[in-house]
């Protein structure tokens, strides 16, 4: 591995360590994003090899991809049978072929089994035994062409996974680098939670004082989103109930809510409608709401007294609806010692029937890191300070042991 690649290798996560990815680049102007994409895949531990069509080399120079990946770039198929070396059926073959950004021309060629460029030849070689993902990029009128749509559907039926484009400015623009990386990790990650159904909440609720002002808290939703995405990486069928103020997520099935009442209704609807294996309540839910919300904006410039009332305790409803579900609660407190924090978590276990409580002292609200104590009925395990992504991994490791 070249030195400049070592400097970024697995610096964001180790999700793709040991995975060999062929980045197959057709001749789209969006190919200019491929340097960043390759580097981001490497930051998660991937070994990336670029294959370029002749038209792609007219948009970005092969040297750019050679720098980005730290590997020789395939721009033609020679006597070294590069397509077989990269994607043939052997022990050192690629784990994934990612066609990005895929033009209408390339998609249609792949659908028809035509392999007249290095890109299409590699895909044809890999098709029978290697996962293939395609990220389209073209003008929207081309994407809407009935034959192009037919070819996309044909490939989907054959097991090819498409990363849907963003529709902006009359174009079907290639998906964001963040979404592509997320989908690649989801595709290649070990599926230890396959067959499990998981419900996760994330973000801060809002309780309105008048039509524009509300009571909320400093939660960003990062912890809940990380937990939901980690579960999806591990193969679970995930439903993420996320507040409007939460950071965004790439989880496939999401429900957006705003108030405690809306969140409770969404949770009850899910638990009444289907059986869940795990429920993780990571949202920062308001404990109080205004008893009499104003219908119009309250005028400023004068003292204001608000009468508050408690909101429903969402966690208390979960086991009433599904007694057998594995319930993970969060307990955030200030000014408590570690022993007092553990005691508060155990009270939640007794009251709500939580199987595991993630207890912390609110120091990490809105930040990228967290320091928590995992509390069960008969154990308490303090974890060192770590990123919320790392904590999500540790949490699911613990849950899997307890299921």
UniProtKB/Swiss-Prot annotation:
It holds the Pfam family DFP. Residues 1-197 are annotated as: Phosphopantothenoylcysteine decarboxylase. One of its GO terms (biological process) is coenzyme A biosynthetic process. One of its GO terms (molecular function) is FMN binding. Disruption phenotype: Disruption of the gene results in CoA auxotrophy. Its EC number is 4.1.1.36, 6.3.2.5. InterPro entries: CoaB-like_sf, CoaBC, DNA/pantothenate-metab_flavo_C, Flavin_trans-like, Flavoprotein. GO terms for cellular component: phosphopantothenoylcysteine decarboxylase complex. Pathway: Cofactor biosynthesis; coenzyme A biosynthesis. Keywords: Decarboxylase, Flavoprotein, FMN, Ligase, Lyase, Magnesium, Metal-binding, Multifunctional enzyme. Binds 1 FMN per subunit. The keyword Ribonucleoprotein does not apply. It comes from the Archaea. Its cofactor is Mg(2+); FMN. CTP binds at residues 287, 297, 330. Residues 198-403 are annotated as: Phosphopantothenate--cysteine ligase. Catalyzes two sequential steps in the biosynthesis of coenzyme A. In the first step cysteine is conjugated to 4'-phosphopantothenate to form 4-phosphopantothenoylcysteine. In the second step the latter compound is decarboxylated to form 4'-phosphopantotheine. HAMAP family: CoaBC (MF_02225). NCBIfam families: coaBC_dfp. In the N-terminal section; belongs to the HFCD (homo-oligomeric flavin containing Cys decarboxylase) superfamily. This is Coenzyme A biosynthesis bifunctional protein CoaBC.
């Amino acid at each position: 591995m070249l030195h400049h690649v070592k400097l970024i290798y697995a610096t964001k996560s180790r999700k793709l360590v040991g995975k060999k990815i062929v980045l197959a680049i057709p001749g789209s102007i969006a190919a200019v994003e491929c340097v960043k994409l390759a580097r981001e895949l490497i930051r998660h531990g991937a070994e990336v090899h670029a294959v370029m069509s002749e038209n792609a080399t007219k948009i970005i120079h092969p040297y750019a991809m050679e720098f980005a990946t730290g590997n020789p770039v395939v721009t033609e198929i020679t006597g070294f049978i590069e397509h077989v070396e990269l994607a043939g059926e052997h022990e050192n073959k690629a784990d994934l072929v990612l066609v990005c950004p895929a033009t209408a021309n390339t998609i249609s060629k792949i659908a028809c089994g035509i392999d007249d460029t290095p890109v299409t030849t590699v895909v044809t070689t890999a098709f029978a035994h290697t996962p293939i993902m395609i990220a389209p990029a073209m003008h929207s009128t081309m994407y809407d062409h009935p034959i192009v749509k037919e070819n996309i559907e044909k490939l989907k039926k054959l097991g090819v996974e498409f990363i849907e484009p963003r529709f902006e400015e009359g174009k079907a623009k290639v998906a964001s680098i963040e979404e592509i990386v997320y989908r690649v990790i989801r595709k290649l990650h070990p599926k230890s939670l396959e067959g499990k159904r998981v419900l996760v909440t994330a973000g801060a609720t809002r309780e309105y004082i008048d039509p524009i002002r509300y009571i909320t808290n400093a939660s960003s939703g990062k912890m809940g989103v990380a937990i939901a995405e980690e579960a999806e990486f591990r193969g679970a069928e995930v439903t993420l109930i996320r507040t409007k103020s939460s950071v965004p997520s790439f989880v496939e099935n999401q429900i957006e809510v705003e108030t405690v009442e809306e969140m409770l209704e969404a949770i009850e609807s899910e638990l009444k409608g289907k059986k869940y294996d795990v429920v993780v309540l990571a949202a920062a839910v308001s404990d109080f709401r205004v008893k009499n919300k104003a219908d119009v904006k309250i005028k400023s410039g004068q003292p204001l007294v608000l009468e508050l009332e408690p909101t429903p305790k969402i966690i208390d409803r979960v086991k009433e609806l599904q007694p057998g579900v594995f319930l993970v609660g969060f307990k955030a407190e200030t000014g408590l010692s570690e022993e007092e924090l553990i005691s508060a978590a155990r009270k939640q276990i007794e009251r709500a029937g939580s199987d595991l409580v993630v207890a912390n002292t609110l120091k990490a609200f809105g930040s990228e890191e967290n320091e928590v104590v995992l509390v069960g009925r008969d154990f308490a395990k303090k974890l060192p300070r770590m990123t919320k992504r790392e904590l999500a991994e540790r949490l699911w490791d613990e849950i899997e042991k307890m299921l």
